[in-house]
Amino acid sequence: ECFTIKKSKLRGVESNGMICAEDEIGIGTDHAGIIVLPETAVPGTLAKDYYNIKSDYVLEVDITPNRADACSHYGVARDLYAYLVQNGKPAALKKPSVEAFAVDNHDLDIRVTVENSEACPHYAGVTVKGVTVKESPEWLQNKLRIIGLRPINNVVDITNYIVHAFGQPLHCFDADKIKGGEVIVKTLPEGTPFTTLDGVERKLNGRDLMICNREEPMCIAGVFGGLDSGSTETTKDVFLESAYFHPTWVRKTARRHGLNTDASFRFERGVDPNATLYCLKLAALMVKELAGGTISSDIKDVCAAPARDFRV
C-alpha cells in the first residue's frame, strides 16, 4: 500500500527518509535491511533508472460483481474497444496468436479424470518436459511489479501474467509429483487434512473440490495450491492446468477456508469458459519460450458441456 514518507524525529535526530529493504520497494526478495550500492553507482541517478524499472500507466478499475469479464487487461481493453467502435472511432483489439502451438512428442502423458462435472464443467491440461525454472526475463518481471506482484520464477510468473492479462487463472504442477500419472478432479471425505501453499493444514469439507493424483490431494480447485505439488527450482517437467470451475463451488470453498486469492476472485465471479484452451496454449508456448522444454502430450480436454459465445 502506498504512503507518503514525512519528516520525523527518531531519538531526537531529524530524519527525512526511510530505510527500505529490496522487497519493500519491489526490486528483489531480500529483507535484510540497507541496500548497499557499489561505488560505481552515480549519486543523483533515479532508482527506477538504476534498477531498470520501466515506467508505465496503471489504471485502477473498480469492478462490480456482475462484470467478471472486466477482471483482466484484455477485458478492460475489450470494453474500451466496444465503446470506441460504437462511437465511430478507429480501434483494434489484439491478443497473442496461439497458432504456433504444436505437440512436440508424447513422452509425458498424464491422464485426466473429472469425477464431479457439476463443479468442474471444463478441465484441460498439457505437459511440458525438460524446463529450466529460473528468474523471469526483465520485461516479465516489470509487468508483474507494475501491478504489485512479486516475481517468483519464470513458470509461476507466466501463470500470474496470464491471469491478469486475460482473466483465466492457471495452475502449474510439478509433473513428477503427480503420483500414478493421473490428475483426478473430485471431492474428498469430510475432515481430510490438506496443507496449502501458506503452510497451513486445513480440514477439508466434503464439498471442497480438489485436484488430486492417484494417492493424495494436490490443490484446492480454483482457490489455492498445495505446499508440495507446485513447481520449484528443481522442477524439470510441468503439468499446466486451465479450467472452468463453477462459481458457487469456488465461492463457498473460499469462504469456508477464509481464502481470497487472485484465482478465487475470478472463478467465483465466473471466468470466460471459452478462454480455457486459448490460455492453456498461450501458457505452454510461453513456457517453451522462457523455460525451454518440449510440449510432451496432447491437450487433455474434458468438457461436460461446451460453452457457446454470447450474441449481443
Protein language model features and the residues they cover:
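RNA/tRNA-interacting regions in translation and RNA-turnover enzymes
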Residues: 1-312
